[in-house]
Swiss-Prot record:
This is 2-dehydro-3-deoxyphosphooctonate aldolase. Coiled coil: none annotated. One of its GO terms (biological process) is keto-3-deoxy-D-manno-octulosonic acid biosynthetic process. Gene3D superfamilies: Aldolase class I.
Length: 281
């Protein structure tokens, strides 16, 4: 089965290519922290030879509580992203929540992201597709892997085939997510690259009184399980002080653990992709 290659500048994203990393922080907490986090990611990924795209959100529009921190907003967020790109010369990805944001974000970011909760919103999907930008499509927690075909078709019908799929877990009762490893094989039938968002797969939605809980201690175990499935790469969030992060701290990797964490996953990715394909159907 031929696998499509999506090119982000000089980076090739495909299920049969070396793993890429879409990594950063959950939300832009401040300009200085964003610069600190990106600098560490760049240092580590350059050392390990992992192609890298910086990730953060300018607005978290689906927080549990009305009092939760959402981010700096569109205008200030784009200013921070522009400075990061100038300083570190890295591609950028961020999420879009409303149709009118799509074109603005696509002018600054190399990849625009369709949030999981919004992935069936046709007006948003079409607006994003019409920008011509690469789109990272998060699989909704309530969708089966095969249902992602409908979202891909919406984008294709709007004239955009620069698409990446991203697994982030499925709802399993209340306040819990699980990852069905069989889903990766189903989505590979669509031939687009697949990333694994290990951070949000560890989330426990609504698990705390006014925000999501998480299972940071299991991030390496779950990341290894995902990378073993011959994927295009990993989607990861890290934080200098996860216990005091403004969003999804319980899921975030400690920033000072980034190098040993990625070193193991790179080695695993190389091993898995060195094996010949065995057809078992």
């Amino acid at each position: 089965m031929a696998q499509k290659i999506i090119r982000v500048g000089s980076i090739e994203v495909a299920n049969d290519k070396p793993m890429v990393l879409f990594g950063g922080m959950n939300v832009l907490e401040s300009r200085d922290m964003a610069m600190q986090v990106c600098e560490e990611y760049v240092k580590v990924t350059e050392k390990l030879g992992i192609p890298y795209v910086f990730k953060a959100s300018f607005d978290k529009a689906n927080r549990s509580s009305v009092n939760s921190y959402r981010g700096p907003g569109l205008e200030e967020g784009m200013r921070i992203f522009e400075e990061i790109k100038r300083t570190f010369n890295v591609p950028l990805i961020t999420d879009v929540h409303e149709p009118h944001q799509a074109a603005v974000v696509a002018e600054v970011c190399d990849i625009i992201q369709l949030p999981a909760f919004l992935s069936r919103q046709t007006d948003l999907v079409v607006a994003m597709a019409k920008t011509g930008a690469i789109i990272n499509i998060k699989k909704a927690q309530f969708l089966a892997p095969q249902e992602m075909k409908h979202i891909l078709t919406k984008c294709e019908e709007a004239g955009n085939d620069q698409l990446i799929l991203c697994e982030r877990g499925s709802s399993f009762g209340y306040n819990n997510l699980v990852v069905d490893m069989l889903g990766f094989g189903i989505m590979k039938q669509f031939e687009y690259p697949i990333l694994f968002d290990v951070t949000h797969a560890l989330q426990m939605p609504g698990g705390r009184s006014d925000s999501a809980g998480g299972r940071r201690a299991q991030v390496l175990d779950l990341a290894k399980a995902g990378i073993s499935q011959n994927l295009a790469g990993l989607f990861l969030e890290a934080h200098p002080d996860p216990d005091n992060a403004k969003c999804d701290g319980p899921c975030a990797l400690r920033l000072d653990k980034l190098e040993p964490f990625l070193a193991q996953l790179k080695s695993l990715d190389e091993l898995v992709k060195s094996f010949p394909i065995v057809e078992t159907a």
